[in-house]
UniProtKB/Swiss-Prot annotation:
Disulfide topology: C42-C111
Role: V region of the variable domain of T cell receptor (TR) beta chain that participates in the antigen recognition. Alpha-beta T cell receptors are antigen specific receptors which are essential to the immune response and are present on the cell surface of T lymphocytes. Recognize peptide-major histocompatibility (MH) (pMH) complexes that are displayed by antigen presenting cells (APC), a prerequisite for efficient T cell adaptive immunity against pathogens.
Subunit structure: Alpha-beta TR is a heterodimer composed of an alpha and beta chain; disulfide-linked. The alpha-beta TR is associated with the transmembrane signaling CD3 coreceptor proteins to form the TR-CD3 (TcR or TCR). The assembly of alpha-beta TR heterodimers with CD3 occurs in the endoplasmic reticulum where a single alpha-beta TR heterodimer associates with one CD3D-CD3E heterodimer, one CD3G-CD3E heterodimer and one CD247 homodimer forming a stable octameric structure. CD3D-CD3E and CD3G-CD3E heterodimers preferentially associate with TR alpha and TR beta chains, respectively.
UniProt name for this protein: T cell receptor beta variable 11-3
Subcellular location: Cell membrane
Native source organism of the sequence: Homo sapiens
Length: 115
């Protein structure tokens, strides 16, 4: 009985570690009216210092919007700066904002991280 309980606890801890191992992005989806602001939040994998925001239009591959090394934006050449903005605080969480959002901004916005 004790061995079975120990195995169950070890399994639960392993599953919890696997669940928490990925990038966390919020919201999963967002529906807004035109001209309203929208913000996306990303928490990268712990220990990763490089963070990426991508935009993926319907039927196309992801396009890099901005890349951060720690807090510094090192490649933001594809970020439309008139209505889009991004920041990364303390080299951890990041936000991507669109204000005001236009119909043409309808897309999938993805966050990724790496060492």
């Amino acid at each position: 009985m004790g061995t079975r309980l120990l195995c169950w606890v070890a399994f639960c801890l392993l599953v919890e570690e696997l669940i928490e191992a990925g990038v966390v992005q919020s919201p999963r989806y967002k529906i807004i009216e035109k001209k309203q602001p929208v913000a996306f939040w990303c928490n990268p994998i712990s220990g990763h210092n490089t963070l990426y925001w991508y935009l993926q239009n319907l039927g196309q591959g992801p396009e890099l919007l901005i890349r951060y090394e720690n807090e510094e934006a090192v490649d933001d050449s594809q970020l439309p700066k008139d209505r889009f903005s991004a920041e990364r605080l303390k080299g951890v969480d990041s936000t991507l904002k669109i204000q005001p959002a236009e119909l043409g901004d309808s897309a999938v916005y993805l966050c990724a991280s790496s060492l």
